[in-house]
Design a protein with these regions (language model features):
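Catalytic phosphate/metal-binding cores of nucleic-acid and nucleotide-processing enzymes, i.e., regions
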Residues: 1-92
């Protein structure tokens, strides 16, 4: 499955759960997360989407560590099943 298919499923699943998601692009900062998701419970998530077997670049790992250090919600999801499981656990 391609990363675009995982991303489409992510958008669909978040919207179906009543949330909103936006593509996150920062022209001057490479390696930022793919999506920002705002969920109905008021939480905001920075989400990186990959294909199964995909790897985070060193820059993506650095950005992820920065977000976690700032006490932000961060997730890296590799499959549509992981997207569904993540959504189940974050919207309880």
């Amino acid at each position: 499955m391609k990363e675009a298919a995982v991303e489409r499923h992510f958008v669909w699943a978040v919207e179906r759960a009543g949330g909103k998601t936006w593509k996150f692009k920062s022209p001057s900062n490479r390696g930022v997360c793919d999506r920002i998701a705002c969920l109905p419970d008021g939480s905001t998530w920075f989400v990186e989407l990959k294909t199964k077997g995909g790897r985070l670049s060193e820059l993506q790992k650095l950005h992820a560590a920065d977000l976690v250090a700032l006490n932000q919600n961060y997730a890296c999801l590799w499959t549509t099943e992981q997207v569904d499981q993540w959504l189940l656990t974050t919207t309880r």
